[in-house]
Amino acid sequence: MASLIYRQLLTNSYTVDLSDEIQEIGSTKSQNVTINPGPFAQTGYAPVNWGPGEINDSTTVEPLLDGPYQPMTFNPPVDYWMLLAPTTPGVIVEGTNNTDRWLATILIEPNVQSENRTYTIFGIQEQLTVSNTSQDQWKFIDVVKTTANGSIGQYGSLLSSPKLYAVMKHNEKLYTYEGQTPNARTGHYSTTNYDSVNMTAFCDFYIIPRSEESKCTEYINNGLPPIQNTRNVVPLSLTARDVIHYRAQANEDIVISKTSFWKEMQYNRDITIRFKFANTIIKSGGLGYKWSEISFKPANYQYTYTRDGEEVTAHTTCSVNGVNDFSFNGGSLPTDFVVSKFEVIKENSYVYIDYWDDSQAFRNVMYVRSLAANLNSVMCTGGSYNFSLPVGQWPVLTGGAVSLHSAGVTLSTQFTDFVSLNSLRFRFRLAVEEPHFKLTRTRLDRLYGLPAADPNNGKEYYEIAGRFSLISLVPSNDDYQTPIANSVTVRQDLERQLGELREEFNALSQEIAMSQLIDLALLPLDMFSMFSGIKSTIDAAKSMATNVMKKFKKSGLANSVSTLTDSLSDAASSISRGSSIRSIGSSASAWTDVSTQITDISSSVSSVSTQTSTISRRLRLKEMATQTEGMNFDDISAAVLKTKIDKSTQISPNTIPDIVTEASEKFIPNRAYRVINNDDVFEAGIDGKFFAYKVDTFEEIPFDVQKFADLVTDSPVISAIIDFKTLKNLNDNYGITKQQAFNLLRSDPRVLREFINQDNPIIRNRIEQLIMQCRL
C-alpha cells in the first residue's frame, strides 16, 4: 500500500548521524545562554537585562531597583525602601533614633526547633529563644527595645522563600514586612525623630522608591528578577549614587573608546516604527461553504520619515508568535458553513518587529553591547471579513483588539529578496482590549483577541515612537563596513519556493484522475519510487532521504508515536525509538491502556463526543500498526502526494522534506475510523462525531463508548474511506447488497474501483472530497 512511505519514514526517521544532531542542536539552541564577553566582545547576543535604557530627554527617571550596595551604616532617605538580601542567618539590619526606639531584624534558617542563641545587637550580647518550624522557608524576626540597655521583645515575623526583607521610613513610622510569602504584607512601628534613624546593614541591599512599593512587595513575595549582564554584578559603595551622570542627546554618536583599528561608538536614536500585519486566507474546495485556514504571515514594510532634519529610509518585518487556533463547524453537510482554523493573537502571544534604517547606527551592527530601548504602546484593532457564501446571508468575522507593549530588544537579521540586513528585533507583549470579536450569524461571540482575518482594519500601517541606544564595536576607518553575518537569503528563498509550491500543489487537486489514484494507492511506495520523478534525485538520493527523515522526525505524526510510547509505561519499557511503530502493533498493553484511560475520562467527562475524539486521535497509529487488506487514508494521502510530485514543475530536493512532512500532517484532516463487531459497526471521527449501526440495514443503534474502546484494543481499525453518511445515501438511492456493504466498510479497493468505473456519483463525490482535503 502507498502508506508504506509513512511507515518507512516513522521507522527510520530517528536514524540520524551524531554529528548532524550535534550540529543541529548547536544551530537551534536559543535558551539558557550565559554571556561574559568582556570589552570589545565579538558576540551576536545582546544583553537581556531589559531596563528602561537610556532616557534621552530632560526628565530625570529614578531607577526601579538601585543596587546592590555593600553593607554599611547610613541614614537612608525618607520614603525609600531598603531591600535587604542576606545570604546567611543572623542579624541582618539595625536601626535606632538613639532616643526611644532600637530595632533589629534577625534571620533564622528553616527547620530550627526552639533553642537559645546569642546575638550581638547594638554591640551588646543578647540571649534570645528562637525557632522556625518551617521546613523550607526562612524566618525574619523583629526585635525591639525602648532603651539602650532595656529588655528585648520579639515582634512581627516574616516567613520567606526568596529570603528578602525590607525596611522604610515613612510618615513618622518604620515600615517592615510581615506574614508569609507569597502573601506578605507591610507592618509598621511608631517612632519619634523617624527621619534621623540610622540604619546599619550587615548584608547587600538595594534601594527602591516608595512610588514602586508594589514592585518591592512583588520582590519580597517572589524574589528578584533574573539579571544577566556583560560583566559580573559586584555590590558598590553607596557613595556611587553621587556620581555625576552626563545626559545624552536624543540623536548623537559618541566615541566611547578607540584603538588603531577599532573604536566603540554609542549611538542614540529617536525611532519611528511603522509596521503592518499580513495574512493568508485559504478557501477549501467543494461548493464554496468551507474555509480551511486564516492565518498570520510575516509582513515587510518600507517607508521614510524625518529624524532631526534628516530623511531616513526604514524597513520593518512584522511577525507573530504564540498564536491561538480557533475554528467553527456548522455541520457535516457540503452546504454547512465551516472554518477549520483561524488564528487569533491574545495575551499569551508575542509580536516581533525587526527594524533597520539607512543611518550610521546600522552600518556596523555586528558587535553590540548595552542595547536598550524605550518605546510607546500601540493599539491594534481588527476590521471585518465577509465569508461570501454562494447562497444565504454571509457570516462576518468582525472586531477584536490588542495593545502592544514593549518587552525587550535584541539583534536580528532581516531577509529580503535581494539583501540581508542586520537589524534590531523589538519584542512586544500583548494585552487584549475592547472591542471583542465575533462571527456574526453564529454563536461565536464575545471572544477577545485580534483575529487574522483583517488585523490592519483598513490602515496602511500602525506606528510606534520611541528611542534606542547601543554601543557598537566598529572599524576606526569610517569607510569600512563590517560584513553582514548572514549575507545569503537561503531560508527566505526556501520559504518563497515552499509558498509557490503549496499554491501549485493545491491547484493540482483538480487534475487527479480517480481511477489512476486508486491504482496508485495500492502500490507499495517506498522513498525511491515516491521521489523518482524529481530531477537530480538519483545523484542526491542518500542526502535527500536523510533530510526527509530528519524533517519527518519533527512531524506531528512522529511526535504522536513518541508521545504514545512515552506515556504508556508498560509499552515504553519494551519499545525502542527505532522500532516504535512495529512494537506498538504487538504491544497489547499499549492499546489496553487506551481503554483504561477512556474509562477514567468517562468518570470525569460526560460528553461521549469528547471520549470518542480522544480515542480517535490514536486510531491512525493503531491502523498503521495493524495493516489490513483495505485501503486507508494514508494510502490516498501518499498517492495524491506522489501524483502531485510527478505533476509539479517547481518541486526540488530542497523542498521535498518540508512538503512530505506537511503532507503527513495536513492531508485529509477530517478522518473517521471504524471497527466491526459481527454485524455491528462503530465509527468515530477525530472531530468527535460518532455512529453505531447495523451492516445490513444501516439502522443506527446506541453507541457504547466502552465497547468501542475495547474493540479498538482487540480488533483491526479501518479507515472510513466511505463514511456512514455516504453509505446510507448510497443504499437509499441505489441499494447495495450486504456483501457490497461489508466490502465498502472494509475499504476494499477493488469494490471502490468498480463503483468509480461505473461513474457512481455518490462514491466519486466522496473520493473527490478526500482529494480536495489533500491541501498544504
Curated annotation (Swiss-Prot):
Designated name of the protein: Outer capsid protein VP4
Remaining remarks: In group A rotaviruses, VP4 defines the P serotype. Some rotavirus strains are neuraminidase-sensitive and require sialic acid to attach to the cell surface. Some rotavirus strains are integrin-dependent. Some rotavirus strains depend on ganglioside for their entry into the host cell. Hsp70 also seems to be involved in the entry of some strains.
Annotated region (Spike body and stalk (antigen domain)), positions in chain: 248-479
Organism superkingdom: Viruses
GO BP: permeabilization of host organelle membrane involved in viral entry into host cell; virion attachment to host cell
Disulphide connectivity of cysteines: 203-216, 318-380
Transmembrane segments: none
Motif KID motif, chain ranges: 644-646
